[in-house]
From Swiss-Prot:
The gene is spoVG. PANTHER family: SEPTATION PROTEIN SPOVG-RELATED. This is Putative septation protein SpoVG. HAMAP family: SpoVG (MF_00819). It comes from Borrelia hermsii (strain HS1 / DAH). NCBIfam families: PRK13259.1. Keywords: Cell cycle, Cell division, Septation. Coiled coil: none annotated. It holds the Pfam family SpoVG. Could be involved in septation.
Length: 96
């Protein structure tokens, strides 16, 4: 499965404590779209969070997620490459 498009929606937070940097939409093989991947700045660097929902008991469950580390790295790399391309001032992006 090839990543054929990555679209970044940067979040301009007025709250200085906010860790959310962007929402991402990824297209696979020009036939499947995955919305609402989040780019987050954490204590150990920047990482992606897959789309999830909150259960009745307050836990968060992924709606979709990579099942192996190799694909997660491919996906994360494509997202970060596009993020830096669209936000050249973010070259200090530290991957967590």
């Amino acid at each position: 499965m090839n990543i054929t498009d990555v679209r970044i929606r940067r979040v301009d937070n007025k709250n200085p404590g906010s860790k959310l940097l962007a929402y991402v939409t990824v297209t696979f093989d020009d036939c499947l779209v995955l919305h609402n991947i989040r780019v987050i700045r954490g204590q150990k660097g920047v990482f992606i969070v897959m789309p999830n929902r909150r259960t009745k008991v307050g836990e968060y469950k992924d709606i979709v997620h990579p099942i192996n580390q190799s694909f997660r790295e491919i996906l994360q790399s494509a997202i970060f490459k596009e993020y830096v391309k669209e936000n050249p001032s973010s070259l200090e992006l530290e991957i967590g």
